[in-house]
């Protein structure tokens, strides 16, 4: 029986993408199938970063193709192509930045900044081009967490070059003021400074810009949510009732301005004693998971109250780079992958494909 495209595609459909739960044929990720006698070749284009998984995908797809009678040699080329996805209506995308993801919390002290930096590093580790904007004007922490000192350079006196470490571009007000200097600014001034940090930084072709939002739902957060083209937001909370109450306010804020929630991270979900291994739910159990179910959001996962996460962030080497194959780093990487896959499934942004239309009165 002659080897046919239909037979091959049927075999390739048996291989599921574990990130989407769908096969590569149905999602149209598999392209350019070529049959030349017993030689078969095809491309797979992933819409999300998955560098650590590509070898496994290739092996499974080649095995599926070779299970078909008449197939001798298989060439599978797997690449990643991350594109811009739609943001809030009426807000133009930033040049050089494809997707902006806000990491937010209703209150401080729930581990939002630590989550933001590790998500950024996890996306970069999987092959994405990533930037990190420290939007917490009053309490910038990303310079310390990313182990970066010094001030940004400016080549034209008007824009700034982003700082960089661990393959991630970073900008923060913390680079522009002394470490112990308090930012005693009113809301409009802080908001203006933040917009300048965002728009006057020469970001270099980013797939994702992670924005470490200020805690709460005040003027700065609302203005940012309305003016910054956000692909989506990740909510960070602890299981504690008071934290969940404030997290709900953050969710409502994003809903009102049309920013979709990509998922919820439950931080400090459990404490495991380092001496005896006793498990204790200091802040309550499964509060974040229950809230995600209540609001129909994706539950991205839970992180324990872990001293190593804190020590690594304080030392300027966050968990994902300090212990990349450790249990905590793998949790962050799984969360980042879920976020990226959720973004890849969103509507694409085609605004750059259409010419702008200007209407003027005849003179």
Question: What does each model-found stretch correspond to?
Answer:
Residues 207-208, 214-315:
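Conserved catalytic-core segment of NTP-binding enzymes
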Residues 1-31, 68:
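N-proximal, solvent-exposed amphipathic alpha-helical segments enriched in charged/polar residues
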Residues 123-185, 191-199:
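Phosphate-binding loop that captures ATP/GTP phosphates
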Residues 315-326:
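C-terminal boundary of histidine-terminating zinc-finger modules
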Residues 27, 74-98:
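Short, basic phosphate-binding NTP loop
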Residues 100-137, 251:
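Walker A/P-loop phosphate-binding motif and the immediately C-terminal alpha-helix
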Residues 5-8, 29, 36-41, 45-75:
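Short, non-transmembrane amphipathic alpha-helical segments
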Residues 169-224, 235, 244:
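Switch/coupling sub-region of P-loop NTPases
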């Amino acid at each position: 029986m002659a080897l046919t495209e239909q037979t091959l595609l049927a075999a390739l459909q048996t291989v599921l993408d574990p990130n989407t739960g769908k096969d590569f044929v149905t999602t149209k990720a598999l392209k350019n199938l070529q049959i030349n006698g017993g030689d078969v070749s095809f491309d797979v284009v992933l819409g999300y970063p998955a560098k650590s998984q590509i070898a496994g995908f290739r092996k499974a797809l080649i095995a599926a193709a070779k299970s078909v009678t008449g197939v001798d040699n298989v060439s599978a080329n797997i690449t990643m192509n991350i594109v811009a996805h739609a943001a809030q209506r009426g807000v133009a995308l930033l040049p050089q930045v494809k997707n902006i993801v806000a990491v937010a919390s209703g209150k401080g002290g729930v581990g939002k900044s630590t989550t933001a930096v590790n998500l950024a590093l996890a996306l970069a580790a999987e092959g994405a081009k990533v930037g990190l904007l420290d939007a917490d004007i009053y309490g910038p922490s990303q310079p310390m967490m990313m182990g970066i000192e010094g001030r940004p350079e400016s080549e034209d006196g008007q824009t700034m070059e982003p700082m960089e470490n661990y393959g991630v571009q970073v900008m923060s007000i913390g680079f522009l003021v002394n470490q112990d200097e308090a930012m005693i600014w009113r809301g409009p001034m802080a908001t203006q400074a933040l917009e300048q940090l965002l728009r006057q930084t020469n970001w270099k072709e980013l797939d994702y810009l992670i924005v470490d939002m200020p805690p709460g739902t005040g003027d700065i957060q609302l203005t940012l949510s309305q003016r910054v083209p956000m692909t989506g937001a990740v909510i960070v909370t602890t299981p504690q009732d008071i934290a969940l109450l404030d997290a709900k306010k953050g969710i409502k804020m994003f809903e009102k301005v049309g920013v979709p929630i990509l998922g919820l991270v439950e931080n400090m979900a459990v404490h495991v004693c380092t001496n005896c291994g006793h498990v204790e739910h200091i802040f309550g159990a499964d509060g974040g998971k229950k809230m995600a179910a209540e609001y129909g959001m994706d539950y991205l996962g839970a992180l324990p109250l872990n001293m190593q996460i804190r020590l690594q962030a304080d030392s300027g080497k966050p968990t994902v780079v300090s212990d990349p194959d450790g249990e905590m780093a793998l949790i962050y990487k799984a969360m980042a992958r879920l976020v990226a896959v959720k973004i890849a499934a969103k509507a694409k942004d085609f605004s750059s494909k259409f010419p702008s239309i200007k209407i003027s009165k005849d003179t």
